[in-house]
Amino acid sequence: MHTVQKDTTFTKIFVGGLPYHTTDSSLRKYFEVFGDIEEAVVITDRQTGKSRGYGFVTMADRAAAERACKDPNPIIDGRKANVNLAYLGAKPRSIQTGFTIGVQQLHPAFIQRPFGLTPHYVYPQAIIQPSVVIPTPVQSIASPYIDYTAASQAYSQYTTAAYDQYPYAASPAAGFVGYGYTGAVQPPITASTPAAPATAFVQYQPQQLQPDRMQ
């Protein structure tokens, strides 16, 4: 006679980012305050017996599992962990303002486009004169993060080898694309190569700006 397996879709919790000294008992001790626990296990390496940095906890009911996943910054054994329902996988770590180091935000006067300029033309202050406009690739003018390479590097300090081995957790850092300032280079003109038209740049003098447009 076969035993019917209990559905643990909404009660089984994935716990990532665990310290390597975390054990089954210490993991259980953290989650028992949220309700009854059916199982708490830390995944270990078969050869070395050392923790892989993540584990699973199965709560007795759905309400207890929801309470356990509410804390956005759970601290287990002195380290910030990643707690979420197992079928959803690891929670993605959102980019905070701490990753904007070295990124200069745009002045609102340049975002409003009063002179018909496209969002791809911005003024990098302290780099060139205000009267010169250079083409700069910007993914989203509403986003304060222009240099995604810096954000990717800052994010990498939170990733561990344990997440690479966990099937639910994809590497979020791979989704960032680096953007930077690029200059247009015109190829040399030869007898066999026709002359390419010069790149058009939009330019206007700063004295044409009205004071009310810079507010």
Swiss-Prot record:
Function: RNA-binding protein that specifically bind the 3'-UTR of some transcripts, leading to maintain their stability. Also acts as a mRNA splicing factor. May play a role in myogenic differentiation.
SMART domains per record: RRM (SM00360)
Subcellular location: Cytoplasm, Cytosol; Nucleus
Domain RRM per the UniProt entry, residue ranges: 11-88
Example of a GO cellular component annotation carried by this entry: cytosol
Record's protein name: RNA-binding protein 38
Organism, as annotated: Gallus gallus (Chicken)
Any one GO BP annotation for this protein: cell differentiation
Keyword check for Cytoplasm: yes
Family as reported in the entry's similarity comment: Belongs to the RBM38 family.
GO molecular function terms listed in the Swiss-Prot or TrEMBL record: mRNA 3'-UTR binding
UniProt key word Chloroplast: no
Keywords tagged on the record: Cytoplasm, Differentiation, mRNA processing, mRNA splicing, Nucleus, RNA-binding
